[in-house]
Amino acid sequence: MHNLETPRLKLGVFNPLDSLGQALIAAALHRQHEVSALLDDLNGITARPGLRCKLGSLESVETVKQAIAGLDAVFACLGGERQEDLPARCGCLIDGALALGDAGAPGLFLVGRWEWLVDSDDSGDEALGAGLRRSLDASGLDWTLVEMPPLAAGLRVDDFSGEATTIGSEARRALDCAEALLDELRLGLHRHQCLRLRGANGGRD
C-alpha cells in the first residue's frame, strides 16, 4: 500500500543498467515512486512490480522527448559515456525536455564525471564544456549536475534488497548515492549547481 504522506513521483532513468541506475531503481521503488527504465532494448532489463520500461536513448531529441514525456524527473547516468560524447548526449536531453514546454519539462539530473567541466585547467576541456554550460544556463530548465564517485560495476537491483546489515559494501556505497540523489530531488538544494556525491554514506557537497 502506498504511503499517502509520501508524494509519489514519476521518475525516469537513462542507462538503467549502470550500477547507479540500478541503485536508483531500487531506492525509488522502495520509496514507492513510479520508475521508468529508459533504454533502447526493452528485453534488456528484468520486469518487477512498479518498474516500467520505455524505449528511449540520448541519441536524438525526438527519442528523448518521447521517453521523458509525463515524467516528473529524469536521471541520466552518464558515467560510462566518453567525455567528447557528453555535450551531444546532454544537448539531446536538454532539447528533448525543452520540446515538452514549460509545463511538461521534467527536472534533469545529469550524473557523471564533471571535473573537466567545473574544475578544468585544460583549454580543450574548457572549450568542450563551454557550449554545454551555455545550454544549461540558457535553458530555463530545472537541472542539477551530479559528480559521482567511482562505483563497482555490474550491480543489480537484487543486490540492494534485504536489511542494511546484509547488503555488501559496494552495493551499500551505490545505494547511499542513490538515496542522496532522491533526497536532493525532494529538497532541491543544488538546482543549477554541481552536486558532488562523496562515496561513504552518500554524503554530499
Residue ranges and their predicted role:
Residues 12-13, 109, 144-146:
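Conserved beta-strand elements of the Class I
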Residues 131-155:
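Conserved beta-loop-beta element that borders a ligand/cofactor-binding pocket
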Residues 34, 42, 80, 84, ...:
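Conserved Rossmann-fold NAD(P)-dependent oxidoreductase catalytic core, especially the SDR/UDP-sugar
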Residues 37-44, 148-151:
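Short, polar loop motifs at secondary-structure junctions
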Residues 2-31:
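N-terminal Rossmann NAD(P)H-binding glycine-rich loop of SDR-like oxidoreductase domains
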Residues 5-8, 14-16, 82, 106-107, ...:
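Active-site-lining helix/loop region of Rossmann-like oxidoreductase modules
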Residues 43-102, 186-189:
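NAD(P)H-binding glycine-rich loop region in Rossmannoid oxidoreductase-like domains
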